Amino acid sequence: QTMKRKLVLPKMRISSPEEFLLLYPFAREVFADGIERSIQRAKNKKKQRKTYSGKKKQHTRKSVIVSDNHRRILIVTKAKSGRRHDKRLADKESVFENLPQDVEVFADTAFTGEQRVHSKTYIPQKKPRGRELTASEKEMNRIISSFRVVVEHAIGGIKRYRCISDKLRNRKAFIDDKFLLLSSGLWNYHLSFT
């Protein structure tokens, strides 16, 4: 209740660009990234396959986080199985479709292809097969990464809270979403005093 009154809780879903502008009128740049948190391994083999993340080599749940340039978390998607890709999760939740076209989005290479949905999306260029990146492409990647570090700091701020950084053993439905939402709200509340 208190965090809701202080307007520090991020939104789980934005339904239109107008709603985004109404909630965050001063956000001109946003930064998107995925967050993975480890969970307890299921006993059932099918459930194990569903939650196993090849990237982290453990069983995880995954969400997409959108923050502004002040490290404040604006949007947190629902947690899905760790096997899913960041882009697929963002597409399912319509994260990029519901951002206004005049807002610049900085993301990592996991979101390649989102430029078709949102025109002002800046993503580092991958090295093409068989050749190297040019010096100007490398410099552009460095610039994009220097902007993107903001969302990494925001994720680090969320992971200060042990309910996010430790392995989740609670099997109640949607408890991981609540933990992530509350940790994001506490991080935003902390930022309002610094």
What are these model-derived regions, one by one?
Residues 1, 7-194:
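Short, well-ordered secondary-structure "scaffold" segments embedded in the functional core
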